[in-house]
């Protein structure tokens, strides 16, 4: 119900509030000869862009191959394929939009990765958005597993509820990810071995510079017990944590 409410707010802004605001500003600022025409055109453009984004735009799916060269990568992992996806917000994928999630899962599986990683924001607001999508999410498989970390939305911070309810919902989100067969990393790491070589997949909880962002990431705890010679792939939802926390406090590659 909350997701439909949020979607309704966005549609109200795109189809009503923003066009009216554009028209009003044009009527107020522009010369009398042009203000009505430009206001109508501006409002129409906003409405068309909103309609496109809500229908065709949201259906766009792009795979971006990136080659990363590391001199200290263990030889056995040369050519190792990692698929990363993030910010799925599957609560938005209801009704006819469910096909988008299926297309995304199909695309991920078509990459034939050695490992799949998800870097947070599986839900919009609450874990009750997730059960109807577990069948699709459970299709994600890779030889070395599927790993995930939590994003700010996964902590239920945007839900209007007391702290105990939010904590319970966060635990439920974690449980759903595990039911999908994902290995959720909460300030912890796993070791992937190939012969005598190894690669560390570390997952740090969310840490962000914004005030409302959860600050649960702990670099020391995430890498506890590892030697500095270990090759580390660090998973984290918020990009700001890379320079602010991870680089100064670790040797993660």
Residue positions per predicted region:
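Non-catalytic terminal accessory segments
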Residues: 1-61
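Soluble catalytic domains of enzymes that build or remodel membrane lipids, polysaccharides, and related
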Residues: 76, 80-253
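Sparse, context-dependent recognition of short Cys/His-centered cofactor- or disulfide-binding micro-motifs
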Residues: 36-40, 46-53, 67, 73, ...
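Generic intrinsically disordered, low-complexity segments enriched for polar/acidic and small residues
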Residues: 2, 74-77
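Hydrophobic alpha-helical transmembrane segments in integral membrane proteins
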Residues: 50-71, 92-95
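Short, charge-rich amphipathic segments
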Residues: 30-44, 67-74, 100-116
């Amino acid at each position: 119900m909350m997701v439909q409410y949020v979607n309704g707010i966005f549609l109200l802004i795109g189809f009503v509030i923003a066009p009216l605001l554009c028209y009003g500003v044009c009527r107020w600022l522009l010369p009398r000869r042009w203000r009505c025409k430009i206001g109508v055109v501006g409002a129409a453009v906003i409405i068309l862009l909103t309609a496109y984004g809500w229908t065709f735009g949201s259906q766009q799916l792009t795979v971006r191959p990136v080659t990363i060269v590391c001199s200290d990568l263990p030889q056995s992992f040369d050519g190792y394929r990692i698929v990363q996806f993030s910010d799925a917000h599957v609560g938005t994928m209801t009704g006819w939009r469910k096909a988008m999630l299926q297309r995304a899962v199909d695309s991920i599986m078509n990459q034939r990765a050695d490992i799949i990683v998800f870097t947070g924001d599986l839900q919009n607001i609450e874990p009750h958005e997730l059960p109807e999508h577990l069948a699709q999410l459970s299709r994600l498989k890779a030889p070395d597993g599927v790993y995930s970390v939590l994003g700010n939305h996964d902590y239920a911070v945007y839900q209007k509820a007391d702290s105990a309810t939010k904590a319970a919902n966060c635990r439920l989100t974690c449980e759903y990810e595990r039911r999908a067969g994902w290995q959720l990393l909460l300030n912890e790491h796993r070791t992937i071995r190939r012969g005598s070589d190894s690669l560390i997949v570390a997952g740090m909880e969310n840490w962000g510079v914004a005030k409302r962002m959860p600050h649960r990431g702990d670099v020391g705890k995430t890498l506890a017990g590892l030697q500095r010679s270990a090759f580390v792939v660090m998973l984290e939802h918020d990009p700001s944590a890379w320079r602010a926390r991870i680089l100064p406090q670790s040797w993660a590659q």
